[in-house]
């Protein structure tokens, strides 16, 4: 394997991180890393929630950064033009692209394969759940539940506001003998948290085969046998109903899925929807109510909202 790679750095806002990651995945990217200052700020404000953290990381500037790694071939300039144009157009979709600066650097393979790990330390994200990277040690407290995670470079650290709100909602609404469906399971973090919080059976689905593989690997790290991970669309690959459906995606996808999701939720069950930027919160609430959901609560953290609704 070549030892020298091209690193594309996009300087942006926390709001645009997922959108820009999606842009990179539409190209020939070999790896993606995310540096979100809001993760660092969360750790700064919750010093008791992590076991150890490199003080130098607390000096990270306010700009969020997405880095994509490419081989230098004849397609790279085409990819770069696509990235620049797509980032520039984010404003048209109501997404704050922040600085929107795109830079290219040459880097060694060893640098980008491991540097992203320094941003990821054990973090307590709810009353019970601690997200722990598999390469870190952590002294578990009696009441804590440890989620072992190797997100890989394709996924966030699990400490993003949207993930934290989902986990806190799962902690509140999961009871024993409950079934949970996780739409867009990514690294599997919500599926694993649901199982460890007492769900009897969990099904996670994702359209991305990389996510499916990552979820399955993380389930093995946690020694769980009550989680099923499927590749595809919820409506096409899952049968039956759940007591809770959780989706940490984006507002437009949640709005699109709402009518279909209703058929997969038991009477009295909950739909936990996050990944919703605050400016789109009312649009999601309107669609949920039009579809027959009752809004149970709206959680907000930073620029993001998590909406918990119920089917009676």
Curated annotation (Swiss-Prot):
Keywords (A to Z) from UniProt: Cytoplasm, Methyltransferase, S-adenosyl-L-methionine, Transferase
Class of the enzyme per the UniProt entry, highest EC level: transferase
Gene Ontology CC terms, in alphabetical order: cytoplasm
Catalytic activity field: L-lysyl-[protein] + 3 S-adenosyl-L-methionine = N(6),N(6),N(6)-trimethyl-L-lysyl-[protein] + 3 S-adenosyl-L-homocysteine + 3 H(+)
Superkingdom field: Bacteria
UniProt cross-references to InterPro entries, sorted A to Z: Ribosomal_L11_MeTrfase_PrmA, Ribosomal_PrmA_MeTrfase, SAM-dependent_MTases_sf
Keyword check for Ubl conjugation: no
GO biological process, one term: methylation
SUPFAM superfamilies documented for this protein: S-adenosyl-L-methionine-dependent methyltransferases (SSF53335)
Assigned EC number: 2.1.1.-
Binding site for S-adenosyl-L-methionine: 163, 184, 206, 248
Location of this chain's protein in the cell: Cytoplasm
Keyword Cytoplasm annotated: yes
One of the record's GO molecular function terms: protein-lysine N-methyltransferase activity
Family: Belongs to the methyltransferase superfamily. PrmA family.
Family matches, as HAMAP family: Methyltr_PrmA
Role summary: Methylates ribosomal protein L11.
Name this polypeptide is given: Ribosomal protein L11 methyltransferase
Species: Clostridium botulinum (strain Hall / ATCC 3502 / NCTC 13319 / Type A)
């Amino acid at each position: 394997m070549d030892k020298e790679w091209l690193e594309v750095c996009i300087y942006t806002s926390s709001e645009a991180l997922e959108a820009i990651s999606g842009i990179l995945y539409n190209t020939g990217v070999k790896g993606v890393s995310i540096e979100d200052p809001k993760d660092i700020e969360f750790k700064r404000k919750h010093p008791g929630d992590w076991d150890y953290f490199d003080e130098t990381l607390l000096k990270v500037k306010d700009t969020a950064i997405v880095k994509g790694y490419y081989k230098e071939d004849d397609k790279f300039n085409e990819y770069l033009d696509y990235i620049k144009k797509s980032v520039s157009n984010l404003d048209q979709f109501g997404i704050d692209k922040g600085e929107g600066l795109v830079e290219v650097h040459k880097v060694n393979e060893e640098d980008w394969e491991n540097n992203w790990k320094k941003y990821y330390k054990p973090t307590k994200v709810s009353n019970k759940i601690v997200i722990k990277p598999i390469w870190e040690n952590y002294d578990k407290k009696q009441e804590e539940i440890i989620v072992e995670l190797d997100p890989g470079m394709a996924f966030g650290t699990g400490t993003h506001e949207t993930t934290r709100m989902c986990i806190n909602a799962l902690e509140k609404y999961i009871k024993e003998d409950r079934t949970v469906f996780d739409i867009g399971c990514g690294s599997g973090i919500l599926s694993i948290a649901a199982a460890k919080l007492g769900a009897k059976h969990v099904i996670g689905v994702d359209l991305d085969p990389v996510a499916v593989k990552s979820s399955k690997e993380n389930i093995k790290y946690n020694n769980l046998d009550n989680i099923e991970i499927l590749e595809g669309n919820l409506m096409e690959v899952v049968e039956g109903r759940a007591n809770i459906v959780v989706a940490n995606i984006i507002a437009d996808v949640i709005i699109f899925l709402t009518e279909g999701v209703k058929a997969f939720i038991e009477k009295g069950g909950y739909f936990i929807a996050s990944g919703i930027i605050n400016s789109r919160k009312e649009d999601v609430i309107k669609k949920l109510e039009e579809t027959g959901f009752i809004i149970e609560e709206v959680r907000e953290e930073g620029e993001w909202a998590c909406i918990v609704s119920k089917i009676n």
